[in-house]
Amino acid sequence: MRLTTKFSAFVTLLTGLTIFVTLLGCSLSFYNAIQYKFSHRVQAVATAIDTHLVSNDFSVLRPQITELMMSADIVRVDLLHGDKQVYTLARNGSYRPVGSSDLFRELSVPLIKHPGMSLRLVYQDPMGNYFHSLMTTAPLTGAIGFIIVMLFLAVRWLQRQLAGQELLETRATRILNGERGSNVLGTIYEWPPRTSSALDTLLREIQNAREQHSRLDTLIRSYAAQDVKTGLNNRLFFDNQLATLLEDQEKVGTHGIVMMIRLPDFNMLSDTWGHSQVEEQFFTLTNLLSTFMMRYPGALLARYHRSDFAALLPHRTLKEAESIAGQLIKAVDTLPNNKMLDRDDMIHIGICAWRSGQDTEQVMEHAESATRNAGLQGGNSWAIYDDSLPEKGRGNVRWRTLIEQMLSRGGPRLYQKPAVTREGQVHHRELMCRIFDGNEEVSSAEYMPMVLQFGLSEEYDRLQISRLIPLLRYWPEENLAIQVTVESLIRPRFQRWLRDTLMQCEKSQRKRIIIELAEADVGQHISRLQPVIRLVNALGVRVAVNQAGLTLVSTSWIKELNVELLKLHPGLVRNIEKRTENQLLVQSLVEACSGTSTQVYATGVRSRSEWQTLIQRGVTGGQGDFFASSQPLDTNVKKYSQRYSV
C-alpha cells in the first residue's frame, strides 16, 4: 500500500472515529437530559396529587388528576398502600399519528404527606417517537452529511497535496526494479523537489558511468580483436577463430574456405603519391571488402598483414568460393580509374579449402601459396591451392530439400551438453541439434544460415520449443536450454504463439526453460527484444545470451535486458591462459555483469588450465569437453548425473 493511501486512510479513520464518538456522546447527553427533565415533571405531578389528597378523596380528584396526566403524558396512576393497590386511574387513548408506537416507562413516587403510601405512574417515553419524525432528525442528518462531504473533500485535497510524493515513490520503485536511463527521470510535480533533483543527479551520474564503462568494454574488445587502422578483425583474432573451427569440438567434420586477398603495397605507393592520397585509396578498398563480405552470413574478414586481408568462410565450398572471388573482382572493376593503381591488376585472391583436424599454420601457408600463384597469373585473378579435395558442400536446392525433410520428420537429432558451476553441479543442459543427410551429421552452425536464408526460422523454432516441453516431464530436475533465433523472436505472430504455448505449461516447468540468443543479434535488435524478453521473464522462462565476445558490440544491453546467463564464445576461451588480451576481455564482461543477476559462463573449455584461468577472472560456470562432451539425448535415461569433476 502506498504512503498516500496509508496516510489518507489513517486520517479518515481518525476523523471518522472522532465524529462517531462526538455523535455518540451528544446523543447520550441529549437522551439523558430529556429523560431527567421528564422524570422531574412526572414527580411534580405526583407531588401535586399528594397535596390534593390531603383535603380530598382520590375518587373526587379524578378530573383534576386526568388533566395532570394529559399534561405529562401519563397513561395510568396507581395509588398503593405498601404493595396493595388502593385506587387506579387510566387515561383513555388519545390520537396518535399512523406508524407511531407507544413506549412506556414506570415511576414509583413515595407520598410524603401520606406515609406508607406511594404513587405508581406509567407514562409515555418522550424519546419513543423522536426519531420517527423527519423534522426532528433532519438537522442531525444534514450535519452528518455535511461532515461526510467535508471529510471527502479534505481527503481529496490531502491526496492532491501528496501526489508529488506518490510520484516520487513510484519512480523509486521503478529504479529498484532495475529501470535506468531517461525513462526514469523525474518531473516538476514530484515532491519534495530537492529529493527529486538529487535522485535525477545520481541517475545521470550512473548513466554517465555506465556509458564510460561500456566504452571501456568496447575498447577492450577492440584491443583484443580489432585492427587499429582499419577497424576490421586483426590477425590474432582470425587465427584464433580458425583454430577453434579446425578443432571441431563437436566432431561433426567442420569445413570451409580461407580466402587471402592481396592488395597493392600502399607503403611503397606513399613514397611516390603522398600519404593522404594513398590512405584515401586504401580505405576505399578496405570499405569495399568489408561491405562485400557482409553479404555472407558467418563470414569473418580480417586485416592479416599490411595489404593482405583474410576472409574466413565456414561451411563454404570451393565452388562457392570461386563465385565469391569472381563477384569481388567485378566489384573492384567498378571502382573509378586513377593514376595511382592499375584497376586491371589491383587484387589477387588465394583460395584454400580446410577440414577439421588441420593445423592453422598449414591452412594459412596454403592460402599464401595460392595468393602468390594468383599474382603470377597477372591481372585481377584468383587461384586455388588444391582443387582435388572432395566437395562437402550442398547447393541451395539440396539444402532446402534436406531442411524441409528434417522439418516434416519431426526435427533434427538432439544432443545434450551439461553446463556446470564452479562446484561441479549441473546448472543446465544445452540441447544441440544436428541433421543427418544420409551419410553424416551436419551441425546447427552449418545448416542454420540456410534455415534463415530460406525463411524457415519461425517454423524451425516452433518445432524445437514444442519438442522441448515434453522433455521437461521426463527430467523434472533438469534445466534445459535451447537456441532460438532472434529473427523469430521479434515477430509478433511468433510472440503470441510462444505466449500461448508457455501458458499451457505448469509454472514449475516454465522455470526450467532457458532460451539462448546470439549476442550479435541481441545488440542489433535490442529495442525490439525488450518487450518479448519482459514477457518470457514474466512467464518464468529464463534467457541466456551466447557467443559473447565474437563480435564488437556494446555491453549496454546487459543492464537493459534481464538476462540470466552470458556465455562466452569458444574462440575467446581457447588457450586463454596464454592470452592476456582475452583474459582482460573476460574480466571486463564479468565486471559489466556486476550489479545484475547475469552470470558469466564459458563454453568450449578443453583443459584445466583454461578452467582455472577463467575462474580467476570471475567466471561462474563452464561448458565443454573438459567436463563432458555432447551426448545423444536419450529419453530412456531416467536421471542424468548432476555432478561432474572440475
UniProtKB/Swiss-Prot annotation:
Residues 254-387 form the GGDEF domain. It is a multi-pass membrane protein. It comes from Escherichia coli (strain K12). It comes from the Bacteria. Serves as a specificity factor required for RNase E-mediated decay of the small global regulatory RNAs CsrB and CsrC, it is probably not a nuclease. Nor does its activity involve c-di-GMP, despite its domain composition. Positively modulates motility gene expression, is also required for curli expression. Keywords: Cell membrane, Coiled coil, Membrane, Transmembrane, Transmembrane helix. Disruption phenotype: Dramatically stabilizes CsrB and CsrC RNAs, small RNAs that sequester the global carbon storage regulator CsrA; also decreased transcription of CsrB/C. Decreased biofilm formation, decreased expression of DgcC, a probable diguanylate cyclase and of the curli regulator CsgD. Decreased expression of the curlin subunit CsgB, decreased curli expression at 28 degrees Celsius. SMART domains: EAL, GGDEF. This is RNase E specificity factor CsrD. Residues 194-224 form a coiled coil.
